[in-house]
């Protein structure tokens, strides 16, 4: 049983805790919040004994083996480093950090302290994503890939009203590519590895983050186009095209439905049932990595390549974070 703590008390933290408990491999033993009242309110639903308003105190506690980090993006690196250096296993929400330098430093820290560092990118852990990977040979020679995630942000009106929510604030290492565009990018890396080159364009808001963008990656015989937006909705599915047919994926981040369309023939539904809480699978994988002490697991390479591409995409589109000027 992995005794774990959480940083953050929002909806995604609650969903992860429920998934972790559903797996039967975890027990929530500590909650951190800047507000003791907020920590207590969250803890009441899960019978948690240890509450903290100090990250340092929680890192020094002997009540936890692992921590789930769901704080703003800009805080991921410093919090991850703190717990890794105290030999606490870390599962951190995507993106793992603000840039490649931070990701490299975090991976080095995990190896130095011989603990597991895991980026919580749930898509790659889903049964239908594994099915998608296994189905790739069906399309024959790969030619074109289109991954799409465009969703009008519930916080965009607040931005238009003159507020500066975290979602559109570069101080929090945020924006479209770092948020929902990440699912498209990391999915491509998980399936196809590192591209030969990347070209990116984006529309920037006055705050300095990207509102929407397009990324084109060259893999030689085939190309991958990523479309992302936080200021518009899209009803288009994602698609992997080959000379023998195409794979169609509805809602890529959740892999809700996967179909194969042979060239000149009818669509075939390949979809497998998935748990209603799609965070279950990443919770199970992280537990396996911790139980088997797999510090150098394959996910680290995907995280590093994704961070490298994110950093280059932001360089090309002119999105700059305060973290980019910090020397590590």
Swiss-Prot record:
Q: What is its EC number?
A: 1.-.-.-
Which UniProt key words apply to this protein? Oxidoreductase
MF term (GO), any: oxidoreductase activity
Residues folding into a coiled coil are none
Highest rank taxon of the organism: Bacteria
Per its UniProt entry, what is the enzyme's top EC class, as one word? oxidoreductase
Report whether Oxidoreductase shows up as a keyword of the record.
yes
Which Pfam families does this chain map to? GFO_IDH_MocA, GFO_IDH_MocA_C3
What InterPro entries does the entry give? Gfo/Idh/MocA-like_OxRdtase_N, GFO_IDH_MocA-like_dom, NAD(P)-bd_dom_sf
Q: Which family does it belong to?
A: Belongs to the Gfo/Idh/MocA family.
Q: What is this protein called?
A: Uncharacterized oxidoreductase YgjR
Q: Which organism is it from?
A: Escherichia coli (strain K12)
Q: What is the lineage of its organism?
A: Bacteria, Pseudomonadati, Pseudomonadota, Gammaproteobacteria, Enterobacterales
